[in-house]
């Protein structure tokens, strides 16, 4: 049985698994620094950093933000030794039921086989690809933004809400200059 469990730094074993998987699955420019990630995990009320367990065994991680009008999946990864085993599909089906609201996530532009496959994976799970220009802001001062695309699931009209969603992500989640993660009203 798969379980998605919020994890904080005090849970050293599970948090260490999540942190190592994030560092393996995402290059530095696609994730915040370790200190800030830990701070958000422990203190930001809108940020949920989760370990994915199957029968008590660690198999992956997923982090998302509660944004009011939608949820934003920031990072999702299955242990590399377990990929292509159907876990990703099962976890996203669970998340879609648990979150009970529109979901937004970022994907790399389809410039290679892996990014194309990832987009098709999300499409099979009923996510819609939006081709409007979108730049993921840098996680660190001095880094460059990354060209990405947004995908959505659920009742969200990106024709009219794209700019609002983008501004919310920029303001509340992604900028290294964002306010202190301790203040859920401004973080």
Locations of regions flagged by a protein language model:
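Conserved active-site alpha-helix within GNAT-family acetyltransferase domains
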Residues: 110-131
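Conserved beta-strand in the GNAT
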Residues: 51, 57-65, 72-77
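Short amphipathic alpha-helix that is part of the acyltransferase structural core
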Residues: 1-35, 148, 161-175
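Active-site rim helix/loop that mediates acceptor-substrate recognition in acyltransferases
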Residues: 26-49, 53
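Conserved small/polar residues in nucleotide/adenosyl-binding loops
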Residues: 176-182
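Conserved GNAT acetyl-CoA-binding A-motif
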Residues: 99-111
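Conserved acetyl-CoA-binding loop-helix of GNAT-fold acetyltransferases
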Residues: 78, 84-97
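A contiguous, mid-protein "functional segment" used to position or interact
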Residues: 129-161
């Amino acid at each position: 049985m798969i379980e998605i469990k919020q994890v904080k730094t005090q849970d050293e074993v599970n948090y260490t698994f999540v942190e190592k998987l994030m560092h393996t699955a995402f290059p530095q420019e696609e994730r915040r620094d370790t200190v800030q990630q830990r701070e958000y995990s422990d203190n930001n009320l809108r940020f949920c950093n989760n370990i994915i367990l199957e029968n008590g065994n660690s198999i992956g991680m997923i982090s998302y933000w509660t944004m009011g009008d939608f949820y934003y999946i920031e990072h999702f990864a299955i242990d590399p030794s377990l990929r292509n085993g159907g876990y990703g599909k099962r976890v996203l089906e669970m998340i879609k039921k648990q979150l009970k609201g529109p979901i937004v996530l970022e994907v790399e532009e389809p410039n290679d086989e892996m990014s194309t496959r990832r987009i098709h994976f999300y499409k099979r799970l009923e996510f819609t690809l939006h081709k409007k220009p979108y730049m993921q802001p840098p996680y660190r001062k001095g880094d460059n933004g990354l060209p990405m695309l947004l995908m959505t699931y659920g009742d969200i009209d990106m024709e009219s809400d794209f700019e609002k969603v983008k501004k919310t992500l920029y303001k509340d989640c992604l900028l290294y200059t964002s306010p202190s993660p301790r203040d859920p009203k401004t973080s």
